[in-house]
Amino acid sequence: GRGKAGGASRWWLHHSLAALREKLGGLVLLRGETRAMLREAVAATGADAIVWNRCYEPYAVELGRGVVTDMQALGVAARSFNAALINEPWEVKTLAGKPYTVFTPYLRAARQRGVATPVPAPSLKVCSPPKLGLSLDDLGLAPKKPDWAAGW
């Protein structure tokens, strides 16, 4: 994303990536321009599809479109998903087809839509990660001071 993450955010990210690496049995970590790194990862792994959680900031939407274009050129399926919202920003509209600008009418309309039933998690085929990328420590995410874990 844009901007620099603070110490607490970097500490959290370091430990979240470590837990994910443990759960998956490996994790490829890359640093660089996102689209170039994804092309490199696809080439190294032979992936036939990539998926990611959708972000809604304008720069992230533009990045997602670029990734789709890159992957289509490589013959790789690319798809983003809603990961954290009950409703996508474009799903709840006024009767005139415009976004709501006042919360209470939005809330009423959103409640009428209901909440989709969660789908079960897919089964994943886990493979050994390729010899590609950086170690978690190479990313330099875990600051030494202050100790963000003290008292937890």
For the regions a protein language model found, what residue spans apply to each?
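Glycine/tryptophan-enriched, flexible segments
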Residues: K98-W152
